[in-house]
């Protein structure tokens, strides 16, 4: 969601913060702002729209002198996107400037309290309330200092938050706190930083401290101190970031999304190769034992968005190889559904960022009810990873485009390994079958690379269909799970209305939407159901639809039935989903490109969803 950056050091803060905020644009935003302490007062500039507007207003930051500052990119949750609602928020008397990622759930109660204290409010946001609350508490007991005021404010605020705070009369100190929303500290040489994510500060330091729940960071140019909610100083580990800034750049591609699509063969290799050792799978599980897997009688897969569609594919594999019933639940629904969970339940939670708030809260609900919790996460040291019993990292590297591609594929490859591993633990996957499937996984990157080299044909197909108003995706079994992801990719970045349906359900109502010229993308990679899919294609063609099929090379009847076909190589069916998703990603990309859409930062979307 929102992006936070803060700096304290010898350099001019504003230009540095503006540059760092650009590295967080992938999180999604509708406005931005910056606050600088110049030694006498706090200067704040905010603007609706792109960061370029803020840069122009501040002459690239040069009109805001000072070596302490905070910056913010906002994705609206309280109040419409405009200059007034943008962050940072300056308190009524100008003592405090504050940036915030999250939601203050009890903002009405706090607003009423502050109104009684003589405060009025300029914006519609919950963040302005937080800024004024900190100021009120600071002014009420100034001799105890900013830390005491912040700590007391945290005890009064309900909700999820990451806060960056500066005080007019402390122009040498930057404060940061977090609860349920990610925030890191960058440790430099004679300078220090805060940020929502590593790419923002990677140009300046590779030394990072990840704040935990209720941690407060107090930063000067030469020191970093971390305290818990009780004011006790903590000694935190400093993490050295291995990947470099170039990994977060486009590398010659016009968009991050295309770069990340093309990186997928290497990503899959990086994800699976270290986990296949001498014909066996080593997932590095230290707490969930083979005995726990054998005793398991139910599995929940809990995720949001594309990760939930990975879960839909994983369900087929895990049930096939373990015969354990699997339920895929949207994280936003799971925690409110009174799920039937016991100590024999395994909850698999999937999140690229490891900070998705709905998934985090669902994880906590599963733990509270006694489930074993295993997470599949990309970001090392993230909250979901830290709170899970075991974690499998996807090692996909930074994913900048809002629409996920390589993280999806990495999650999928982990799920292949997990299904086989669990099946082997339960003595339902033989050594021979395991070897065959692992061989297929190891051959997958080469097949993916060959398929991606044929992207020009997908671009041609996109040129035929980019003006469609509605596009429907259909499939059966695993193909339906892939259709869901293909449809989501298309509507995320092209803004074309699209839905995915189980092909067998067409006749139960959906077929009434089909009219002459409708485009139906029909997935036909699951060979046991080929004949039924061809019948479904004929059904929609009879109503005037244009059929674009996605099929495995050599599948009989497809070429004769469909208007166009996206072919994928014939290989072991075990890994077909990883191949089938590539043309769907490319099709969505090229349709959006031809429509002139903002591919990497589609409207109204955020990369890391850290509010409910």
Tell what function each PLM region has.
Residues 1-250, 254, 266-297, 336, ...:
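Conserved short alpha-helical segments that host acidic/polar catalytic motifs at enzyme active sites
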Residues 67, 71-84, 277-291, 315-350, ...:
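Glycine-rich oxoanion-binding loops at beta->alpha junctions
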Residues 184-210, 332-366, 505-541, 571-585, ...:
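Glycine-rich, anion-gripping cofactor-binding loops and their flanking helix/strand elements
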Residues 231, 546, 559-561, 571-612:
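Generic C-terminus detector
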Residues 264-268, 272-300, 390-519, 592-612:
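Active-site phosphate/pyrophosphate-binding segments
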Residues 291-443, 523-566, 587:
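Glycine-rich phosphate-binding loops that contact phosphosugars or nucleotide phosphates
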């Amino acid at each position: 969601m929102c992006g936070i950056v803060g700096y304290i050091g010898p350099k001019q803060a504003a230009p540095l913060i503006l540059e760092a905020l650009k590295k967080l644009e992938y999180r999604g935003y509708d406005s931005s702002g910056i606050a600088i302490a110049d030694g006498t007062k706090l200067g704040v500039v905010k603007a609706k729209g792109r960061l370029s507007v803020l840069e122009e207003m501040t002459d690239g930051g040069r009109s805001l002198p000072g070596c302490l500052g905070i910056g913010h990119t906002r994705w609206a949750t309280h109040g419409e996107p405009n200059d007034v609602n943008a962050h940072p928020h300056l308190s009524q008397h100008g003592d405090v400037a504050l940036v915030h990622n999250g939601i203050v759930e009890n903002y009405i109660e706090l607003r009423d309290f502050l109104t009684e204290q003589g405060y009025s409010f300029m914006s519609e946001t919950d963040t302005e309330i937080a800024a004024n609350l900190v100021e009120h508490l600071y002014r009420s007991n100034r001799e105890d200092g900013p830390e005491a005021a912040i700590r007391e404010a945290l005890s009064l605020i309900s909700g999820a938050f990451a806060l960056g705070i500066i005080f007019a009369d402390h122009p040498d100190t930057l404060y940061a706190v977090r609860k349920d929303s990610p925030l890191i500290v960058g440790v430099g040489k004679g300078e220090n930083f805060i940020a929502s994510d590593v790419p923002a500060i990677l140009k300046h330091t590779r030394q990072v401290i990840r704040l935990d729940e209720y941690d407060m960071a107090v930063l000067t140019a030469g020191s970093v101190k971390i305290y818990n909610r009780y004011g006790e100083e903590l000694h935190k580990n400093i993490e050295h970031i291995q990947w470099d800034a170039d990994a977060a750049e486009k590398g010659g591609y016009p968009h991050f999304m295309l770069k990340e699509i093309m990186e997928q063969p290497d990503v899959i290799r990086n994800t699976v190769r270290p986990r296949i050792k001498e014909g066996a799978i080593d997932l590095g599980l230290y707490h969930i034992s083979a005995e726990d897997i054998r005793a398991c009688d139910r599995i929940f897969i809990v995720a949001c968005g594309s990760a939930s569609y990975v879960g839909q594919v994983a369900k087929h594999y895990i049930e096939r190889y373990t015969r354990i019933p699997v339920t895929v639940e949207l994280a936003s629904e799971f925690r409110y559904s009174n799920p039937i969970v016991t100590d024999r339940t395994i909850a698999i939670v999937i999140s690229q960022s490891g900070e998705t708030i709905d998934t985090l809260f669902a994880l906590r609900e599963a733990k509270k009810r006694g489930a074993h919790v295993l997470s599949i996460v990309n970001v090392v040291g993230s909250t979901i990873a830290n709170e899970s019993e075991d974690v499998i990292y996807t090692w996909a590297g930074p994913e900048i485009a809002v629409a996920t591609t390589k993280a999806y594929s990495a999650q999928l490859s982990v799920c292949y390994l997990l299904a086989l591993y669990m099946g082997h633990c339960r003595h339902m996957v033989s050594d021979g079958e395991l070897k065959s499937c692992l061989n297929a996984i190891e051959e997958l990157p080469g097949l993916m690379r060959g398929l991606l080299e044929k992207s020009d044909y997908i671009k041609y197909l996109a040129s035929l269909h980019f003006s469609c108003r509605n596009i429907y995706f259909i499939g059966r079994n695993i193909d339906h799970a892939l259709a869901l992801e293909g449809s989501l990719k298309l509507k995320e970045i092209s803004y074309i209305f699209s839905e995915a349906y189980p092909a067998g359900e067409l006749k139960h109502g959906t077929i009434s939407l089909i009219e002459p010229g409708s485009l139906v993308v029909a997935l036909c990679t699951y060979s046991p159901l080929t004949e039924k899919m061809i019948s479904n294609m004929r059904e929609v063609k009879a109503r005037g639809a244009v059929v674009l099929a996605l099929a495995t090379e050599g599948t009989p009847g497809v070429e004769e039935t469909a208007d166009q076909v996206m072919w994928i190589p014939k290989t072991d069916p075990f890994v077909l989903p990883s191949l089938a998703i590539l043309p769907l990603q490319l099709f969505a990309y090229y349709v959006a490109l031809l429509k002139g859409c903002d591919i990497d930062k589609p409207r109204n979307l955020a990369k890391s969803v850290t509010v409910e």
